[in-house]
């Protein structure tokens, strides 16, 4: 954990795919933004830092194990977190779930008082853990995560149910057990039942609000 005197406070939210990380992050962002203003709080998804695969064919891209730490460009993410803490803006990559690679365009992200960083593999990398002021692990049963993932990937990402199930059995579940679940030990706060745990969200809001004082 980093010293809280840093200009930009980084809060990490990790957990299984479809565990409710994004819902918690978006709820915290929306409700805190109403209190402090958009210029003081932001959200960065770890998914933006999937490695560029534009040099690979589509057939090769779909074979990538997206639940393994090697799929992430954590070195670039680390550089960006450190830049934000120095007060510098970053060019956030844009990742396409349809094309399975980064887009050419980027999004400028200005430093904020608080940045909420959310993703499945955040706590697996000691370098990233060292940049977090505190971390959260969203602990949701895998069967619930699977049902949510099927609904999300079919409806929002253009996937077939068969491909989602095959990926879950081949990589998602094994990688969760090998990398993601063990990283729970590094979390400062564990949130059960995902993004609908209102008590947990209120506790997190109170904690984060301290950084705006």
UniProtKB/Swiss-Prot annotation:
CDD domains: UMPK (cd02023)
Pfam families per record: PRK
InterPro entries: P-loop_NTPase, PRK/URK, Uridine_kinase, Uridine_kinase-like
Record carries keyword Kinase: yes
Top EC class, one word: transferase
UniProt-listed GO biological process terms: CTP salvage; UMP salvage
Keywords: ATP-binding, Cytoplasm, Kinase, Nucleotide-binding, Transferase
Chief location category: cytoplasm
Signal peptide start-end: none
Annotated compartments: Cytoplasm
Binding site for ATP: 15-22
Transmembrane segments: none
Molecular function (Gene Ontology), one example: cytidine kinase activity
Listed HAMAP family: Uridine_kinase (MF_00551)
Assembly and oligomerization: Homotetramer.
Similarity remark: Belongs to the uridine kinase family.
Protein name stated in the entry: Uridine kinase
Lineage, opening ranks: Bacteria, Pseudomonadati, Pseudomonadota, Gammaproteobacteria, Enterobacterales
């Amino acid at each position: 954990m980093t010293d809280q005197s840093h200009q930009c406070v980084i809060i990490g939210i990790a957990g299984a795919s479809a565990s409710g990380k994004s819902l918690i992050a978006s709820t915290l962002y929306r409700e805190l933004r109403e209190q402090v203003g958009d210029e003081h709080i932001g959200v960065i998804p770890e998914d933006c830092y999937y490695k560029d695969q534009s040099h690979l064919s589509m057939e090769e891209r779909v074979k990538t194990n997206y639940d393994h730490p090697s799929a992430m460009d954590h070195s670039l993410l680390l550089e960006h977190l450190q830049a934000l803490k120095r007060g510098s803006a970053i060019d956030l990559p844009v990742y396409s779930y349809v094309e399975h690679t980064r887009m050419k365009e980027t999004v400028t992200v200005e430093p904020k008082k608080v940045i909420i960083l959310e993703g499945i593999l955040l706590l697996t990398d000691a370098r990233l853990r060292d940049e977090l002021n505190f971390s959260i692990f969203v602990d949701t049963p895998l069967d619930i995560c699977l049902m949510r993932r099927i609904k999300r990937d079919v409806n929002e990402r253009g996937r077939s149910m068969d491909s989602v199930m095959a990926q879950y059995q081949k990589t998602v579940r094994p990688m969760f057990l090998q990398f993601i679940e063990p990283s729970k030990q590094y979390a400062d706060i564990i949130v059960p039942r995902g993004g609908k745990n209102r008590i947990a969200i209120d506790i997190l809001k109170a904690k984060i609000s301290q950084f705006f004082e």
